[in-house]
Amino acid sequence: MARSIKKGPFVDLHLLSKVEAAREANDKRPIKTWSRRSTVLPDFIGLTIAVHNGKQHVPVYVTENMVGHKLGEFSHTRTFKGHSGDRKAAGRK
């Protein structure tokens, strides 16, 4: 179920204050955050936000298409190693 429109998008206040400070100072350094639950706002466009994936901070350059999504969607937490191949088919070739 989607979030109520009357509540508005959720953004952690510490992240919002860091974004506003970076905008005022015209700072292009990545903003480090652990807040995967925050919604991407139009103010974030053009900034690089380093989102924590549980192990490291993954730099995410925010574009116009990302507005309305959560930051955690762009920083994957699991590594897919691939399915094991068919052992019989590999031996025949």
Swiss-Prot record:
InterPro entries: Ribosomal_uS19, Ribosomal_uS19_bac-type, Ribosomal_uS19_CS, Ribosomal_uS19_SF
Functional summary from the UniProt entry: Protein S19 forms a complex with S13 that binds strongly to the 16S ribosomal RNA.
Family: Belongs to the universal ribosomal protein uS19 family.
NCBIfam families named in the record: rpsS_bact (TIGR01050)
SUPFAM superfamilies cross-referenced by the UniProt entry: Ribosomal protein S19
Alphabetical list of HAMAP family matching this protein: Ribosomal_uS19
GO molecular function, one term: rRNA binding
Keywords from the named record: Ribonucleoprotein, Ribosomal protein, RNA-binding, rRNA-binding
GO cellular component terms attached to this protein's record: cytoplasm; small ribosomal subunit
Gene Ontology biological process terms from the UniProt entry: ribosomal small subunit assembly; translation
Name used for this protein in its record: Small ribosomal subunit protein uS19
